[in-house]
């Protein structure tokens, strides 16, 4: 849809195009606008530049989802519409109900609403908080961010979550990548070669030189880059991805003048990505990764949304355009990575810009608690983090060596002395199809430890399709009874339709008859089920009957402080 304006005083005006996109198999609508400025033709007076001070790319008047007679805080979750755009930053573990690029407003023309104050927020507006203050010259165009509107079919939390997860798989299919990641805490070439060999032996798939490892992705020295280029080649020859870490925000830039010039920045300090330092920083990262042939990039502290009031930075003119410029710079880096097949680990919601994975429920102090507490917290974080994310969109954390504290009680090293705990962490994570940053000096320290790692890696890879499928929430971990989840894949052409994992935090055996919601597997009438034990062996199959709701009643038996699982087949 185009909006064209007649020339004024012989000078052509920009054209505004409105684009809509719909998608197969999911009720999602995408909308964006583009401002196109025709090229000045020969003999025509030079046209001026125009500034897109601000824009509203969408405005919807919604049916109020609830009647509020008196004032109270509005609950976004009651809407039957979910909105997200790719203009988002500053949200680590989940997407906030309202972003920097959209908001709900009061509709002043709605005078008959139930609320006495007439302040029911029922008009959705897609517009940036700042700017964008972008100038368009002849022959150029301006493209807004993309707004995505997902229409729910009901109020059930699980169904809404399934819709969200399908949306991400459709709009950002790279989020389905789910490699096994070893966070190496040293960057010495000799120990990295040992890590390559350990990953090759156990089946781990990527090595990230972690924070605190001593690796410097900002180095411009050719000799230094050559070292890691050779290591990346060796990793690739072993079938592994290889890359490193860099911190963007929550640090000082090269000079104080290169920091964001604003009051109360999110991390108290941080570089402006439109400053000279910020521009050189991103260029250096790209040069290093491309030269060395890296295939994974961990970017801590992506652009968090701070405006910058400096009028001296080369990348922006002032405060009004600073947010747009910095967001574009960060998103362009991830798109550049995506174009080259570089996997991006980033603790922020940059999925629609090319990011692969963010935190599932990451809090540093949690991984300094005693090991037994970490086991429960881990399952709680996975349960909570997979309502709106697929399992592959979130990473967890396993402190093989000490992290922020806690000493020997919080760490797994020496690994051979804590095999039961190491096994339990793999059961939590790979039983949920969730990858963690296994951070430490090594993956195994004995043949017994190596056997535990290989057992779980082989299990995950042998059942990868169903373990990476949608996760249905059964019972949240509370340390008082069983907890667990159910993976489901209703595809007609697959044999494994479901895989359920159950965990027992108690010191006594748990035996329960539970209702298993096999409706989500696409099966009707009956299902073939096989029991799995802690050695990951399967029993002979038995048949379970499904009622009209698609529910099967199944007895589960879980040994003390252990786990069991069920494989559901058609």
Regions inferred by a protein language model and the residue ranges of each:
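Short Pro-Gly-centered flexible turn/kink motifs
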Residues: 134-153, 559-569
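Short, acidic/polar
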Residues: 187-201, 278-290, 422
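Polysaccharide-binding surfaces and accessory modules of carbohydrate-active proteins
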Residues: 1-121, 130, 525-541
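An acidic-aromatic substrate-binding cleft motif
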Residues: 157-206, 210-213
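Conserved, mostly hydrophobic/aromatic
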Residues: 33, 139, 199, 300, ...
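Active-site-proximal substrate-binding groove within the catalytic cores of carbohydrate-active enzymes
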Residues: 330-538, 553-555
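C-terminal beta-strand-rich structural cap/linker in extracellular carbohydrate-active enzymes
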Residues: 543-570
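Aromatic- and carboxylate-enriched substrate-binding clefts and catalytic-loop regions
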Residues: 210-404
């Amino acid at each position: 849809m185009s909006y064209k304006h007649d020339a004024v005083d012989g000078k052509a005006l920009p054209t505004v195009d409105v684009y809509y996109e719909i998608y197969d198999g999911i009720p999602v609508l995408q909308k964006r606008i583009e401002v196109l400025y025709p090229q000045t033709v020969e003999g025509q007076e030079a046209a001026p530049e125009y500034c897109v001070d601000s824009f509203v790319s969408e405005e919807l008047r919604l049916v109020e989802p609830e009647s509020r007679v008196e004032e109270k805080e509005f609950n976004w979750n009651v809407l039957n519409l979910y909105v997200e755009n790719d203009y988002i930053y500053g949200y680590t573990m989940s997407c906030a109900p309202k972003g920097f690029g959209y908001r709900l407003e009061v509709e002043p023309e709605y005078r008959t609403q139930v609320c006495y104050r007439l302040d029911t927020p029922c008009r959705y507006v897609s517009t940036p908080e700042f700017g964008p203050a972008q100038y368009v010259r002849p022959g150029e165009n301006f493209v807004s961010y993309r707004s995505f509107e997902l229409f729910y079919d009901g109020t059930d939390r699980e169904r809404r979550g399934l819709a969200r997860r399908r949306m991400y798989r459709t709009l950002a299919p790279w989020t389905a990548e789910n490699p096994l990641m070893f966070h190496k805490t040293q960057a010495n070439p000799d120990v990295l070669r040992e890590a390559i060999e350990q990953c090759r032996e156990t089946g781990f798939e990527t090595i990230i030189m972690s924070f605190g490892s001593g690796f410097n992705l900002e180095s411009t020295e050719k000799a230094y880059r050559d070292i890691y280029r050779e290591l990346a080649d060796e990793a690739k020859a072993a079938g592994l991805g290889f890359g490193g870490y860099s911190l963007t925000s929550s640090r000082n830039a090269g000079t104080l003048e290169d920091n964001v010039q604003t009051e109360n920045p999110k991390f108290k300090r941080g570089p402006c990505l439109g400053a000279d330092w910020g521009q050189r920083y991103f260029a250096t990262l790209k040069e290093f990764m491309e030269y060395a042939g890296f295939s994974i990039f961990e970017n801590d502290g992506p652009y968090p949304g701070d405006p910058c009031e400096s009028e001296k930075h080369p990348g922006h003119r002032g405060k009004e355009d600073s947010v747009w410029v910095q967001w574009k710079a960060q998103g362009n880096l991830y798109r550049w990575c995506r174009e080259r097949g570089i996997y991006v680990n980033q603790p922020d919601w940059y999925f629609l810009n090319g990011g692969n994975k963010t935190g599932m429920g990451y809090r540093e102090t949690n991984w300094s608690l005693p090991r037994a507490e970490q086991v429960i917290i881990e399952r709680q974080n996975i349960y909570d983090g997979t309502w709106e994310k697929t399992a592959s969109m979130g990473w967890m954390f396993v402190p093989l060596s000490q992290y922020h504290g806690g000493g020997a009680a919080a760490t797994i090293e020496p690994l051979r002395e804590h095999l039961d705990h190491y096994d339990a962490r793999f059961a939590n994570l790979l039983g949920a199809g969730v990858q963690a940053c296994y951070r430490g000096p090594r993956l195994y320290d004995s043949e017994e430890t190596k056997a535990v790692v290989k057992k779980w890696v082989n299990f995950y890879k042998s059942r990868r399709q169903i373990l990476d499928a949608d996760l249905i929430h059964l019972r949240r971990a509370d340390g008082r009874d069983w907890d667990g989840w159910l993976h489901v894949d209703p595809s007609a052409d697959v044999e494994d339709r479901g895989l359920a994992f159950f965990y027992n935090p108690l010191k006594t055996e748990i035996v329960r008859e539970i209702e298993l919601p096999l409706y989500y597997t696409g099966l009707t009438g009956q299902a073939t089920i096989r029991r799995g034990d802690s050695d990951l062996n399967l029993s002979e199959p038995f048949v379970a009957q499904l009622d009209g709701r698609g529910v099967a009643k199944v007895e589960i038996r879980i040994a003390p402080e252990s786990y069991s699982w069920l494989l559901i087949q058609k």
